[in-house]
Amino acid sequence: MSLQFNSVALLLVALILLGIFSQNSAVTISAAVLLIMQQTLLSKYVPYLEQYGIKIGIIILTIGVLAPLVSGRIALPELVQLINWKMIVAIIAGIVVAWLGGRGVTLMGNQPVLVTGLLIGTIIGVAFLKGVPVGPLIAAGILSLIIGKS
């Protein structure tokens, strides 16, 4: 199998370099894995990754968020501790972000052309603002509110 020199491969190489330059391992590793998959026999699995990647990523992210509760590093708050303004705002923020993420998934499925812009914005945020790549779903949810689509 020979190497494929196409615009996607060049973009992935650019993302790897951007990830290294910005010291963001999430971008570097993600782009490297996808480049390896694209350039090898693993390319046949890309459609499965495309179909189930977000769902698997959300599951892994949720496991990572819940792990400190299970390990005991973070104690489950007593009911009385839940009744303060910071905790209430945190709960509301969680509800809003989950709702926006749901709208974002729908928008990305219905208007896939917008995914490119969302990805570019997310990559810039991850690379230069030390963000994490959960942005596309929330960004798509916010975009759906702005353009009136879901």
Curated annotation (Swiss-Prot):
GO CC aspect terms: plasma membrane
One Pfam family here: DUF441
Subcellular compartments: Cell membrane
Disulfide cysteine pairs (residue numbers): none
Entry membrane topology: Multi-pass membrane protein
Keyword Transmembrane (UniProt): yes
Keywords of the record: Cell membrane, Membrane, Transmembrane, Transmembrane helix
Family, per entry: Belongs to the UPF0756 family.
Protein name, as recorded: UPF0756 membrane protein HAPS_1649
